C-alpha cells in the first residue's frame, strides 16, 4: 500500500491589485503612507481605524500605514487625486458606489516599469449603520476597515473563505478585524 500526500508549499489568501489594463500594481510607491481621518468621526471610530492599520503594520513588521493625529475637516468628499490620503464619511446615495460599505480609491502611477500606489482615499458610506463593538445592529468599522487597508496596500479580493480580503461582510461580523496566516 502506497500513500502519497500532496501539500501546497504556500497558501496565500490574496490577489494583487491590477490596473484597468490588467497590469499588476506593486504596492506603495513610498515605504509608508500617512492618512488623516475626518474630524467628524467619533474617537471610537478613529481608534478602530488605527487598530485596523496596526494589523497590517504588525504583519509586515513595518509601519506601512501611519494614522496622523491631525484630522481634516472635509466632509462629503469622494476619493480624488489631490496628493492627500483622507478617510471621510458621506452618503453615497445616487453614486455608482451606493451599495458599497466603504470605497477605497487608490491612485497608481507608472514609475519606471511598475505601477505603484501613490495616494489612497477611503470613504465610509453613511447610508449604512456603523458600530465599533461588533453589535448586530450595524457593520463593524474595524472589521471593514482592516479589509479596506488591504486595498490600500495593493491587495485585491480573494476567493478564499474566511480571509480578510474576501469580498463582503455581515452586520456584527468581527472576524476580519485580525489577519490570519493566509493574509
Regions found by a protein language model. Name each.
Residues 9-183:
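Zinc-dependent metalloendopeptidases
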Amino acid at each position: 500500500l502506497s500513500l502519497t500526500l500532496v501539500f501546497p508549499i504556500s497558501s496565500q489568501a490574496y490577489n494583487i491589485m491590477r490596473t484597468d489594463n490588467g497590469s499588476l500594481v506593486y504596492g506603495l510607491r513610498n515605504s509608508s503612507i500617512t492618512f488623516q481621518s475626518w474630524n467628524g468621526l467619533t474617537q471610537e471610530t478613529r481608534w478602530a481605524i488605527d487598530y485596523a492599520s496596526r494589523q497590517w503594520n504588525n504583519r509586515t513588521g513595518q509601519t506601512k500605514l501611519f494614522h496622523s493625529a491631525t484630522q481634516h475637516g472635509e466632509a462629503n468628499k469622494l476619493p480624488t487625486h489631490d496628493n492627500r490620503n483622507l478617510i471621510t464619511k458621506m452618503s453615497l446615495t445616487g453614486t455608482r458606489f451606493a451599495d458599497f460599505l466603504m470605497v477605497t480609491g487608490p491612485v497608481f502611477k507608472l514609475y519606471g516599469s511598475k505601477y505603484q500606489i501613490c495616494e489612497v482615499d477611503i470613504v465610509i458610506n453613511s447610508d449604512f449603520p456603523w458600530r465599533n463593538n461588533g453589535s448586530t445592529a450595524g457593520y463593524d468599522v474595524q472589521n471593514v476597515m482592516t479589509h479596506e487597508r488591504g486595498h490600500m496596500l495593493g491587495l485585491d479580493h480573494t476567493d478564499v473563505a474566511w480571509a480578510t480580503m474576501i469580498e463582503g461582510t455581515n452586520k456584527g461580523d468581527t472576524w476580519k478585524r485580525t489577519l490570519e496566516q493566509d493574509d
